[in-house]
Amino acid sequence: MSSHNGIHPAVRVGHVHLSVSDMDRALAFYRDGLGFNLTGDGRQMGLPMAFVAAGDYHHHVGLNTFKPSGLYHVAFNYPDRRQLARAVRRLQDHGYAVDHATDHGGTVAVYLDDPDGNGIELSYDRPRETWFDAAGNPILKADRIPVDAI
């Protein structure tokens, strides 16, 4: 199998983020029906989002009520900040605009749309010990950072 376009072989699909019409109904399906663990509930902070995962990963499925139901974005997880920075530079070198970058606490991500308007997130995870605060709660934040800081 060839490495088409030079993408790092350790890149994985990190998560899928879905826009849902009813958060309680969605959580009943993903948590109760499928058995995912609720790993973060932004509603506790007034944010219309929740995260579920299998095992101890921060999230495999993100749920929000930001826009009409459907795919919000797909995330590709890079092995480290250096590989993420290379991916951003490659996109920019090919004329694609990166919309913004965000520090989520345990994850740093950049966001853009593909040519058809589908949301794309490229991210890397910080070490697991940085994902939680002193009380063991997941750190949920969305601090904008300069794209060139990646």
Summary of predicted features, one role per range:
Residues 50, 72-73:
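Conserved acetyl-CoA binding element of GNAT-fold acetyltransferases
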Residues 2, 131-136:
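Short functional hotspots where side chains directly engage DNA or cofactors
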Residues 10-11, 20-24, 56, 68-69, ...:
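Vicinal oxygen chelate
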Residues 136-144:
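Low-complexity, intrinsically disordered terminal/linker segments enriched in charged
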Residues 7-10, 17-63:
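Core segments of cupin and vicinal oxygen chelate
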